Amino acid sequence: MVSIIVSPVLCIRVIDDVEEPHHYVINLLSNQSAVDVCFGPLLHTYIPRSLDTMSHPARISLRAPPHLPFIQGFPGIPGGPSRRPPGVHGTVEIRVGAVPIKAKWVRVEIRKHEVIPPGFKTSSSEDRSTWEHVGEIQTLWTPQNTTKEFDVLETADFKFFLPLPENIPPTVMMMKESGIRYELVAAVCYKQKGGMFKKDASSVNKTTEDLRITKHELNSAWPLYNQPDTFNATAANGAIEMIVQRPYSAFGPNDRILLTAVLKSSQPKPFRVKGFECTLLEVVTVTQIPSSQDKKKPKKVAPPTTKSRTVATARYPIDETLGRGGEKSARIDIPMAPDKLLVTVRNGRSIEVGYELEVKAVCEGIPELAVKGIKYVVGPFSRAHSQQAVR
């Protein structure tokens, strides 16, 4: 390698045989910019290899409070006298090197990303993923002299607090990296010197941290979810009735669904009751968001698309005859496998997740009798952990 000093600000380095014989690279260093030019066998042919190899003059990083996570409080639950409001706490650290920089602003924000799961039709691949700000963008630093667009930024730490709205959906990871996720983004906008071949321009250096939002209003121990209720369905002009009773309407991973099913008959003709079947469905609803990049006249908004899958089943055999004035009942216990459940998702921009239970009486000699659409809330914790959190 041969290095030739042309001027105090320009250095030419010629490196032989970089990729192929008789090919050379000339690296031009000017001020804080660098350009690599690759020459072929003929000197008048060249290919730019890197138009900007400079690193950022300031390092930016995010740091959570000492021995604490970024997220404080209980997302989904408002703050109170003894409970801090839910939000993201932390510090943006700016570290400037030996060369001073001029900056325009330092900001921090929360972004929510929603990726539609596979199997749902979208108009384009771009429409499958959307993102939006959560709350306001917080500006931590600007030039003190309001007449200046840029000013010198020194090494500093900026503490911040970003409140979390109560109605945001929780983090949920679905198949093939789809679902809802959040990230904390900190950025600094500074003036980048162009050097010999480029004009001065602004550049943005940013850093991100993943945030996992757990919604505590979904905890199954809240009194709202522990009020018994009843559902019913009839057949044969009301002569046959099925009643489903449940003690609570929410559960979490490793919990069990408990309910009682009762079948009554007032018709003269007896029939055989084989048993009860229960099916818990996970219902995913996707609302397609039109792309903001589409400059054409917006088309008619497509209705939401819903798909369901079975996440748990239970059967209770009876195999007895039911006559006029008689009844058959069963206490049904449905265990929940933790690896098959997500959580209830409300207020998503494009994704919502719900859970519905269907209880069916399997009989011979009468029309199908079923109670459908019994809604449940699925939280992030088991009932035992939820009780501790609520206390």
Label every model-predicted segment.
Residues 2, 6-9, 17-19:
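Acidic, Ala/Val/Gly-enriched low-complexity intrinsically disordered segments
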Residues 10-14, 21-391:
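C-terminal beta-sandwich interaction modules and adjacent acidic
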